[in-house]
Design a protein with these regions (language model features):
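Bacterial N-terminal signal peptides
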Residues: 13-22
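Sec/Tat signal peptide C-region and signal peptidase I cleavage site
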Residues: 23-27
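Feature activates predominantly on carbohydrate-active enzymes
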Residues: 92-291, 307, 332, 336, ...
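Active-site neighborhood of glycoside hydrolase catalytic domains
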Residues: 255-358, 365-368, 372-374
């Protein structure tokens, strides 16, 4: 009998349990993801009743209301047992995003020195809830002290190649919040589509967003709603507007700003920079995040070949190669971004282009560890997204679907492979390690056309990402993690999320 057959009855029982539980963790010790830094079991259980109150004042009130709704309770003081959320001083709970959770039979306390910590403590509490035999919700008595390893715990969703709209993103945001991820990067523009309304440039969406003859994009109102929904869950939404390359959709709309082939901005055209400033100014107004990603990757050597105005620019500025021209363009764009009060992010090709040290570098080229080492040595802050561990368009098992890129030939990008990755190289000095802001997985969608397929590729690898991003550095046991993971997969599926169970026959759920 296959593993699927052996586990089917167990999975069915879990499914029935999760269908009636806000969020369950039924293993002992609790099957928490990500695993906390410190846990200590106490005596007894806390029983949730209709008289249980969820209390939080001031900055704690929003999380108290969120938690009360998740548990089917009413926020505020009641005449029964209580769940208290308190903001305390740094000396009591030190560290940004840290929390202390204490569950006793008559009271639950979540304490943190900032609102984010309270929110993450609430997420851990939700995972501790289970159903007792009499149908009531119970939580084991426990004391947890916890804080994240990395401050950047992200997921990139490519909505340019294939469009995924507000309903799809809100579901992803909910699950990111549940697992303490805090950055959603939206790849909004590429060859296939421009997906954000920009007032004053209607052709960006009228022409650049066409799918089967119909424009598919986010209105500014839709995007503001997504950004606020994420912010309410302590998730920062970072926009990516690709340039100079990966810009075919914008070139179809406004070819006068681009090279002759129509795939990259013309760095010699002053009006192109006016266009960029206008567009990025609007983007900066929509997204309050302090970061703006401008791409800066995969520019071909011949992209500006034979363009007389670019040749003149090279002569005037002393630029000899395509890399030199790209570096010139990048410096101009970084200047625009910084003038808007934002900090620029870019892919790791910008290390080769000698981008200003204020740029945050996102390393993705797993075959170029030398670039990562150079970026660390040169003083850049870093977000790590190596393709061979964190590209969620890569296949998860032998024979399964996935992007057919050259870098996808090192075997399946399984849960085990994700977990095996240690983000910070041993060669990094303490100072260099401190400049690693965190990690970010990338769900590219060239070959992902439906929401069910997208979910299949993201889940449950997203939970392995959360484990690496949050838990302290140290060895990770894939078998132990898989034991904790099992009930979470069933919880996701009970909510309608098409999480992969680990068997190839689950592929039927992509298309059904």
């Amino acid at each position: 009998m296959s593993e699927w057959g052996k586990m089917s009855l167990f999975r069915l029982s879990l499914l029935l349990l999760f269908a009636v539980t806000p969020f369950a963790a039924i293993a002992a010790p609790p099957a928490l993801i990500p695993i906390p830094a410190s846990t200590r079991a106490l005596e007894g259980k806390f029983r949730i009743t209709e008289r249980t109150g969820v209390e939080g004042k001031g900055l704690a009130a929003p999380t108290a209301a969120y938690l009360a709704k998740a548990l089917g309770l009413t926020a505020g003081k009641r005449n029964g047992s209580r769940i208290r959320l308190n903001l305390v001083g740094e000396k009591i709970v030190p560290g940004a995003e840290a929390y202390r959770l204490t569950v006793e039979p008559d009271e639950i306390r979540i304490e943190a020195s900032d609102a984010r910590g309270l929110f993450y403590g609430a997420q851990t509490l939700r995972q501790l809830v289970s159903k007792s035999r009499d149908g009531s919700q119970v939580i084991p008595a426990i004391r947890i002290e916890d804080s994240p390893r990395f401050r950047w715990r992200g997921l990139l969703v490519d909505v340019a190649r294939h469009f995924f709209g507000k309903p799809e993103l809100l579901k992803i945001i909910d699950e990111m919040a549940a697992y303490k991820l805090n950055v959603l990067k939206l790849h909004l523009t590429d060859y296939e589509g421009w997906r954000l309304e920009i007032p004053g440039y209607p052709k960006l969406t009228e022409v650049g967003a066409l799918v089967d003859g119909k424009p598919r994009y986010f209105t500014t109102a839709d995007m503001r709603e997504i950004v606020q929904y994420a912010a309410d869950r302590h998730i920062m939404v970072v926009p990516e507007i690709e340039m100079p390359g990966h810009a075919g959709a914008a070139a179809r709309a406004y070819p006068e700003f681009f090279n002759d082939a129509g795939g990259a901005f013309n760095p010699a055209n002053p009006k192109a920079y006016d266009f960029i400033r206008s567009v990025l100014s609007e983007v900066a107004r929509i997204f309050p995040a302090p970061y703006l990603h401008f791409g800066g990757d995969e520019v071909g050597d011949d992209v500006w070949k034979g363009m007389a105005d670019v040749d003149r620019l090279k002569a005037e500025q002393g630029l000899k190669t395509t890399d030199d021209v790209e570096a010139y363009f990048g410096r101009k764009v970084v200047g625009v971004i910084e003038s808007l009060g934002k900090r620029a992010l870019a892919w790791d090709e910008q290390v080769d282009a000698k981008a200003p040290k204020t740029v945050v570098i996102q390393w993705w080229r797993r075959d170029r560890p030398d670039v990562l080492e150079a970026a660390a040595r040169d003083g850049y802050e870093l977000v790590l997204s190596p393709a061979d561990h964190l590209y969620f368009d890569y296949h998860q098992g032998e024979g399964e679907p996935g992007a057919p890129w050259e870098g996808n030939k090192g075997g399946p990008q399984s849960i085990a492979k994700v977990l095996a990755w240690e983000p910070v190289p041993d060669s990094f000095t303490p100072e260099q390690s401190a400049r690693v802001l965190g990690i970010e997985a990338c769900a590219w969608t060239e070959f992902i056309e439906t929401e069910r397929y997208l979910q299949f590729m993201i889940f449950p690898r997203l939970l392995a990402l959360a484990e690496i991003a949050w838990r302290p550095k140290g060895p990770r046991d894939e078998a132990e993690f898989s034991t904790r993971l099992e009930p979470h997969i069933e919880a996701l599926r009970a909510k309608g999320i098409n999480a992969r169970r680990g068997e190839w026959d689950a592929y039927e759920f992509i298309t059904n």
